[in-house]
Swiss-Prot record, chain A:
Assembly: F-type ATPases have 2 components, CF(1) - the catalytic core - and CF(0) - the membrane proton channel. CF(1) has five subunits: alpha(3), beta(3), gamma(1), delta(1), epsilon(1). CF(0) has three main subunits: a(1), b(2) and c(9-12). The alpha and beta chains form an alternating ring which encloses part of the gamma chain. CF(1) is attached to CF(0) by a central stalk formed by the gamma and epsilon chains, while a peripheral stalk is formed by the delta and b chains.
Molecular function terms, GO-annotated: proton-transporting ATP synthase activity, rotational mechanism
UniProt main location, coarse: membrane
Protein name: ATP synthase subunit a
Gene: atpB
Membrane topology: Multi-pass membrane protein
Cited InterPro entries: ATP_syn_F0_a_bact/chloroplast, ATP_synth_F0_asu, F0_ATP_A_sf
Length: 238, 173
């Protein structure tokens, strides 16, 4: 972000960041188009693209299955599926496509902005807490979350929940932001000097991009895994 | 993160609350669209497949039981037919033996009666032949005698003949 200006605008008294709006919209569109294309012409005996879709569904269901029971798996399956795909695409999109104009980038990884990752994290935490209340009632939920194992644990309980929310969002932001920044720096090296710089920078960029793809996938997986763990903390009866 | 927020603030605003709202709505809309176009159909299809597979397993089990039953039935029928065939053959043998005995008995009787009749016929024939032969011999001898008598009616022989008769007469008394 060093020295880079940001395009914002005000609407209904709220501040919007144009970059995040565009990036998020593009990511969501890509996710939807891919899923829509994969889910056409479903057959009882799966072939080709249907196998891919079923594999992704099975993958995110498998993440849930590790921490919650079967009934909850059905309830949160769609959430985990959408979350995983959206974060995955968001992580990867900035690696191969960044559009900047007048020193303002309009398209990059939306997850390279903490406000986006914290929003996703907040959605997860709200969903988890809501599910806990919906399942056990407020009294038991409160006791289970904040007053266990002892009543004096209350401050630590509150703090833990807040830390969970922060780390969930900031972990992914850190990785993706750092990845993009380094990629930008490598790009800067490539275009700052002569042909020698370019030759040095190309394999560097290649290696770092590959590594970032790996990191982005891992982070999407970790985000969904932690989501399911947090949800299971709230809805599972120990 | 904080520098970022400060940058945001420098532009004359606080946190990008609008972004949070936008992302929350975007995410919900995306989830709804995926639910409608992919998640629902895929899960329905998966459920259908699971049902189909369990049905297939059930029906396979049923078919297996049915096949076993049929095989058992067939085996029983085969055993029955073996027994039946044996009894039929035995019956046929028995009746064949009876028939044979009957035929042989009849044939023997017939042959015996034929033989008896043939014997009788031969006896009759012989008796007839003998009788006719006697007749023939008698007439022949008479003829021969008459011819001999006619030819050799001379004195000497006549005399001898008469003598012998007379002698014969004296002997017979």
């Amino acid at each position: 972000m060093s020295g880079e200006s940001i395009s914002t605008f005000q609407f209904l008294g709220l501040t919007f960041n144009t970059t995040n709006l565009i990036s998020g919209l593009v990511s969501a569109l890509i996710v939807f188009c891919v899923v829509f294309a994969l889910s056409r012409n479903l057959k009882l005996k799966p072939t080709g693209k249907q196998n891919i879709l079923e594999w992704i569904v099975d993958f995110t269901n498998g993440i849930l299955r590790d921490s919650v029971d079967e009934e909850e798996e059905k309830n949160f399956g769609l959430y985990a599926f959408t979350l995983f795909l959206f974060i995955f695409v968001s992580n990867q999109i900035g690696l191969f496509l960044q559009i900047a104009w007048n020193d303002v980038s309009y398209l990059r990884s939306p997850t390279a902005d903490p406000i986006v990752t914290l929003t996703l994290s907040l959605i997860t935490m709200m969903l988890a807490h809501y599910s806990g209340v919906a399942k056990f009632g407020f009294k038991k939920y409160f006791e289970k979350t904040y007053l266990s194992p002892f009543k004096v644990w209350l401050p630590i309980g509150v703090f833990t929940e807040f830390i969970d929310f922060l780390t969930l969002g900031l972990r992914i932001y850190g990785v993706i932001f750092a990845g993009e920044m380094l990629l930008k720096m490598i790009g800067g090296i490539a275009f700052s000097g002569g042909i020698v710089n370019m030759i040095v920078a190309i394999p560097l960029a290649l290696i770092w991009q590959g590594f970032s793809v790996f990191l982005g996938s891992i982070q999407a997986f970790v985000f969904v895994t932690l989501t399911s763990v947090y949800i299971s903390h709230k809805v599972e009866d120990e | 993160m904080f520098s970022h927020i400060t940058v945001g603030a420098a532009h004359g605003s606080t946190l990008y609350v609008g972004d949070m709202l936008f992302y929350a709505i975007l995410f919900i809309v995306l989830m709804a669209l995926i639910a409608k176009f992919a998640w629902g159909p895929v899960n329905a299809m998966l459920k259908e497949r699971a049902d189909r597979i369990s049905n297939d397993i059930d029906s396979a089990e049923q078919s297996r039981i049915e096949a076993e039953k049929l095989a058992k039935q067939r085996k029983e029928a085969l055993d029955n037919s073996h027994a039946e065939a044996t009894s039929i053959i035995n019956n046929a043998k028995d009746s064949g033996a009876k028939e044979r005995e009957l035929i042989i008995g009849n044939a023997q009787n017939e042959a015996k009666s034929l033989k008896d009749k043939a014997k009788q016929d031969i006896e009759q024939e012989r008796a007839d032949a003998l009788k006719s032969a006697q007749d023939d011999i008698a007439s022949l001898s008479i003829e021969i005698a008459s011819k001999v008598i006619k030819k050799e009616l001379d004195e000497n022989s006549q005399k001898d003949l008469i003598d012998s008769y007379i002698e014969g007469l004296g002997d017979s008394k």
